[in-house]
Amino acid sequence: MLGGGSDAGLATAAARGQVETVRQLLEAGADPNAVNRFGRRPIQVMMMGSAQVAELLLLHGAEPNCADPATLTRPVHDAAREGFLDTLMVLHKAGARLDVCDAWGRLPVDLAEEQGHRDIARYLHAATGD
């Protein structure tokens, strides 16, 4: 469903980090991969600091490797840039690729290093064998 009903509510709840609302909507059948009116999926607009929201979305089938059509950023790029190691680890465990570049040729590790997130950069280097 494009931008309506519980699917639109799911993106909003995910963006606000509302764990219980996300859980209720998913259990009621909301599509974890539905796009909102801006063309973004809940996993792309979720509050990156909420690893619980990420876990719920992924548990219900959210695609961890969905790319923004304009920037080619994926949720791992956002988590790395913003400094959310727990969320990044949840995404990686669910199959998110760490070796894909955004539209500017940057990997998640590049974004972590640019922002001074050393713990995330270490994790990404270790996870990719780099």
Curated annotation (Swiss-Prot):
InterPro entries: Ank_Repeat/CDKN_Inhibitor, Ankyrin_rpt, Ankyrin_rpt-contain_sf. The gene is Cdkn2b. One of its GO terms (molecular function) is cyclin-dependent protein serine/threonine kinase inhibitor activity. Interacts strongly with CDK4 and CDK6. Potent inhibitor. Potential effector of TGF-beta induced cell cycle arrest. This is Cyclin-dependent kinase 4 inhibitor B. One of its GO terms (biological process) is negative regulation of G1/S transition of mitotic cell cycle. Disulfide bonds: none annotated. GO terms for cellular component: cytoplasm; nucleus. It comes from the Eukaryota. Transmembrane segments: none annotated. Expression abundant in lung, less abundant in testis, barely detectable in liver, and not detectable in neonatal kidney, adult kidney, brain, heart, or spleen. The keyword Cytoplasm does not apply. Keywords: ANK repeat, Cell cycle, Phosphoprotein, Repeat, Tumor suppressor. Belongs to the CDKN2 cyclin-dependent kinase inhibitor family. ANK repeats lie at residues 5-34, 38-66, 71-100, 104-130.
